[in-house]
């Protein structure tokens, strides 16, 4: 697959917590961020290790006054791992009419059991 840079400015989603390279343990992680979306659908979240295995996933609604306006999100996602490993937490928006990801942001973290 190819990645195409945004042609309409900066990415519309960002993750405030956790930060890049944070160490997380206990089987769940609080993910907080902000952004604006193109349609009224939940954001998707996936925690993926280096092998491409999904360790945890979920959805969260963006709390915004209206579609296209700045809002925030906060969600606790559970994950499963038996050893400490590097993983990427991705938050993204899918669109009904456009195949694939419309907006995507991620952070790399160290996950422990």
Protein language model regions, located:
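Ser/Thr-rich low-complexity repeats and stalk/linker segments
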Residues: 1-3, 10-113
